[in-house]
Design a protein with these regions (language model features):
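Short, low-complexity N-terminal intrinsically disordered segments enriched in polar/charged residues
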Residues: 1-34, 38, 126-136
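Surface-exposed, charged secondary-structure patches
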Residues: 4, 8-11, 43-46, 54-99
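Hydrophobic alpha-helical segments typical of transmembrane helices
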Residues: 15, 27-30, 59-60, 73, ...
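Hydrophobic pocket/interface hotspot
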Residues: 19, 31-32, 40, 52, ...
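Short beta-strand segments enriched in hydrophobic/aromatic residues
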Residues: 35-36, 91-93, 119-122
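Structural motif
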Residues: 37, 80-81, 109
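Flexible, glycine-rich phosphate/dinucleotide-binding loops
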Residues: 41, 50, 122-124
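Short beta-strand edge/turn micro-motifs at domain boundaries
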Residues: 86, 99-130
């Protein structure tokens, strides 16, 4: 299996950037398009477990658009072959001492790259160094 083929990695990096822009600017239509429209799609959030695209879309529609700006760090995108990828990142929001973590599983579907599973969590600021425990 080919890992991080340059063209595939560039595609996933671009769609990840599109997702991030849509998230912080609350472009719900773009977010909806980037999630696989299936009952099998899962998004585990900080305070919610969303099973299926209907639950994910309802959450996005009801969420406040305030306070969405964030700064990303330690983003790792890995592609596996032509049609599967993971995107992991840490994030911080102004005024919140906690570190957010986001994991996404992307699959190339007929409609293009879409998230089929996602997880978001917050942790207290880690005491270890940023490089400790990270893959090279």
């Amino acid at each position: 299996m080919d890992i991080n083929l340059p063209g595939v990695h560039a595609e996933v990096s671009a769609v990840f950037a599109r997702y991030e822009d849509a998230l912080v600017n609350n472009h719900i239509e773009v977010l909806d398009a980037l999630f696989w429209p299936s009952a099998h799609t899962v998004r585990y959030g900080i305070g919610e477990n969303l099973l299926g695209i209907a639950a994910i879309r309802a959450f996005r529609a009801a969420r406040s658009s305030a306070g969405l700006a964030r700064t990303l760090a330690h983003t790792v995108i890995t592609t596996y072959g032509q049609d599967f990828a993971t995107a992991m990142t840490e994030f911080r929001r102004a005024g919140n001492p906690q570190v957010g973590r986001q994991s996404q599983t992307w699959v190339r579907m007929p409609a293009g790259w879409q998230v089929v599973a996602a997880h978001v969590s917050l942790i207290d600021t880690p005491r270890d160094s940023p490089a400790e425990g990270r893959a090279a």
